[in-house]
């Protein structure tokens, strides 16, 4: 008999049944075997008539299953789940492409983003901070606070190097490019504001263990911006901006403190729920980032496409490029003996090169009568996001290698 042939047990006589005519027919017992399995390939699992036949190494194994049981291989189902989780978790890798796509869409069809008004910015940024908090721990933030030298480096990049570069390129805009004074003031205003929450998210995507340090840097610059930003604007632009201290502190709590605290608590006390939602955070974060980039551009599309738009884009590109490079080399010089110098360089670079341009835009619209002052902040939101997340794509590949 062939090794893989199915064996059919012959029915045995369990008794006889007498018909009224006197003839007798044998009464059959329930069959002890079923039809051959659907597949005879090695390692396959098949189901038939309430039994599972598995052919492997020339033998059959039988395991009874219920009629309602799923007939698919558990291994295949599990592999499908793993593949889906990988796809969801890897959504962050397409952020640069999504940012570029949202920029093009905002230029071609502004109504696709104009519905996402400024009132949604705080909840959107808060969600990104929540995603960072879910993937962090209290210990990470304690360790970050214990590095005052790194925090100081980020602060120097934010409020010394960046304002100097802003003043330089703002002056060039007026003296060399002959742009209106309002556009030069707008470039300087961008350099006076605190760090952007998107810098924290960019750091998280590149060096996750550095995200708490980046958050501490941005929180400190945001908290002190209530005093520093008006002072810098007075010296650079000649106009002292009355910043709402209460509103600024409230924004810090809503956008940074509360979402991160919620994420940390969820990670600490509800780990199962945290694990369940973690795979869905990357694609949602990508979507939110696209909205935060496309909306300011779409809302201010007329100013961006003005005759001065291209020159302003070139100047802001040079400003942000110089800021990223200056922050990178600042940390490289400051921490050249540190074991994690490369990670610190990337973190300080993000902190120096990415500003809270949305805050600058709000200040421009509120305190400057000339609408051209708001053009550089609107362009800056898009440029710094494109450049920052392009660096994420490059640096994250290097860290994995």
Curated annotation (Swiss-Prot):
A Pfam family annotated for this UniProt entry: SBF
Membrane topology per record: Multi-pass membrane protein
Transit peptide (residue range): 1-46
Recorded GO CC terms: chloroplast envelope; membrane
Signal peptide range: none
Classification via Gene3D superfamilies: 1.20.1530.20
InterPro entries listed in its UniProt record: BilAc:Na_symport/Acr3, Bilac:Na_transpt, Na+/solute_symporter_sf
Alphabetized UniProt keyword annotations: Chloroplast, Membrane, Plastid, Transit peptide, Transmembrane, Transmembrane helix, Transport
Bilayer-spanning residue ranges: 93-113, 122-142, 159-179, 185-205, 215-235, 247-267, 273-293, 299-319, 372-392
The protein's name in its UniProt record: Probable sodium/metabolite cotransporter BASS5, chloroplastic
Source species: Oryza sativa subsp. indica
Family: Belongs to the bile acid:sodium symporter (BASS) (TC 2.A.28) family.
Subcellular location: Membrane; Plastid, Chloroplast envelope
Main location, first listed in the record: membrane
Its job: May function as sodium-coupled metabolite transporter across the chloroplast envelope.
């Amino acid at each position: 008999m062939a090794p893989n042939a199915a064996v059919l047990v012959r029915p045995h006589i369990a008794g006889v049944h007498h018909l009224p005519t006197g003839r007798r027919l044998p009464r059959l017992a329930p069959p002890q075997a079923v039809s051959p399995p659907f597949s005879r390939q090695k390692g396959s699992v098949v189901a038939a008539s309430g039994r599972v036949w598995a052919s492997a190494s020339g033998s059959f194994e039988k395991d009874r299953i219920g009629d309602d049981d799923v007939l698919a291989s558990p291994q295949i189902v599990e592999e499908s789940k793993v593949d889906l989780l990988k796809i969801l978790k890897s959504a962050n890798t397409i952020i640069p492409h999504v940012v570029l796509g949202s920029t093009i869409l905002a230029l071609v069809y502004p109504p696709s983003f104009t519905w996402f008004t400024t009132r949604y910015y705080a909840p959107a940024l808060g969600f990104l901070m929540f995603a960072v908090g879910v993937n962090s721990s209290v210990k990470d933030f304690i360790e970050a606070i214990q590095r005052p030298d790194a925090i100081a480096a980020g602060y120097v990049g934010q409020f010394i190097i960046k304002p100097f570069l802003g003043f330089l390129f703002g002056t060039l805009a007026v003296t060399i490019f002959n742009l209106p004074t309002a556009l030069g003031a707008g470039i300087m205003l961008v350099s006076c504001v605190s760090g952007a929450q998107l810098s924290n998210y960019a750091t998280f995507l590149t060096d996750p263990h550095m995200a708490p340090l980046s958050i501490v840097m941005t929180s400190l610059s945001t908290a002190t911006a209530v005093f520093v930003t008006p002072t810098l604007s007075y010296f650079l632009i000649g106009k002292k901006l009355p910043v709402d201290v209460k509103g600024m502190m409230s924004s810090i709590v809503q956008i940074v403190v509360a979402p991160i605290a919620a994420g940390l608590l969820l990670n600490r006390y509800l780990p199962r729920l945290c694990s369940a939602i973690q795979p869905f955070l990357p694609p949602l974060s990508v979507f939110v980032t696209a909205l935060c980039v496309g909306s300011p551009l779409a809302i201010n599309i007329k100013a961006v496409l003005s005759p001065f738009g291209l020159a302003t884009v070139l100047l802001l590109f040079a400003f942000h490029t110089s800021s990223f490079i200056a922050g990178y080399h600042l940390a490289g010089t400051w921490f050249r003996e540190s074991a994690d110098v490369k990670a610190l360089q990337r973190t300080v670079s993000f902190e120096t090169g990415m500003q809270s341009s949305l805050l600058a835009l709000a200040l421009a619209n509120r305190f400057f009568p000339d609408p051209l002052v708001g053009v550089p902040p609107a362009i800056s939101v898009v440029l710094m996001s494109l450049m920052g997340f392009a660096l994420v794509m490059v640096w994250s590949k290097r860290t994995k290698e």
